[in-house]
Curated annotation (Swiss-Prot):
Membrane topology according to the record: Multi-pass membrane protein
Pfam families: ATP-synt_C
Organismal lineage: Bacteria, Pseudomonadati, Pseudomonadota, Gammaproteobacteria, Alteromonadales
Similarity comment: family membership: Belongs to the ATPase C chain family.
Subcellular localization(s) per the UniProt record: Cell inner membrane
Protein name: ATP synthase subunit c
Gene Ontology MF annotations: lipid binding; proton-transporting ATP synthase activity, rotational mechanism
HAMAP family, alphabetized: ATP_synth_c_bact (MF_01396)
Organism: Pseudoalteromonas translucida (strain TAC 125)
SUPFAM superfamilies for the chain: F1F0 ATP synthase subunit C
UniProt site positions, description: Reversibly protonated during proton transport: 60
Role of this protein: F(1)F(0) ATP synthase produces ATP from ADP in the presence of a proton or sodium gradient. F-type ATPases consist of two structural domains, F(1) containing the extramembraneous catalytic core and F(0) containing the membrane proton channel, linked together by a central stalk and a peripheral stalk. During catalysis, ATP synthesis in the catalytic domain of F(1) is coupled via a rotary mechanism of the central stalk subunits to proton translocation. Key component of the F(0) channel; it plays a direct role in translocation across the membrane. A homomeric c-ring of between 10-14 subunits forms the central stalk rotor element with the F(1) delta and epsilon subunits.
Subunit structure and binding partners: F-type ATPases have 2 components, F(1) - the catalytic core - and F(0) - the membrane proton channel. F(1) has five subunits: alpha(3), beta(3), gamma(1), delta(1), epsilon(1). F(0) has three main subunits: a(1), b(2) and c(10-14). The alpha and beta chains form an alternating ring which encloses part of the gamma chain. F(1) is attached to F(0) by a central stalk formed by the gamma and epsilon chains, while a peripheral stalk is formed by the delta and b chains.
UniProt xrefs under InterPro entries: ATP_synth_csu_bac/chlpt, ATP_synth_F0_csu, ATP_synth_F0_csu_DDCD_BS, ATP_synth_F0_csu_sf, ATPase_proteolipid_c-like_dom, F/V-ATP_Csub_sf
Length: 77
């Protein structure tokens, strides 16, 4: 039984950790592409900024869903 609990804790840690790493990589790629696009066509910067913030919310939601699933694994199952 202790082995199962230990593996559950490792699974929760990996789920939260990989979710955070994926979110960080996503934000980095998105920010870099946004800056490249604004440097090429500065007149499109306001519309690109709105789209970037919408995508930032969606990318961040992936990490929050991962944390929610991890909490269910930790406290319910």
């Amino acid at each position: 039984m202790e082995l199962v609990l230990g593996l559950k804790y490792i699974a929760v840690a990996l789920l939260i950790g990989f979710g955070a790493i994926g979110t960080a990589v996503g934000f980095g790629n998105m920010g870099g592409k946004f800056l490249e696009a604004c440097a090429r066509q500065p007149e499109l910067a306001p519309s690109l900024q709105v789209k970037m913030f919408i995508l930032a919310g969606l990318i961040d939601a992936v990490a929050m869903i991962g944390v929610g699933i991890a909490m269910v694994l930790l406290f319910v199952l």
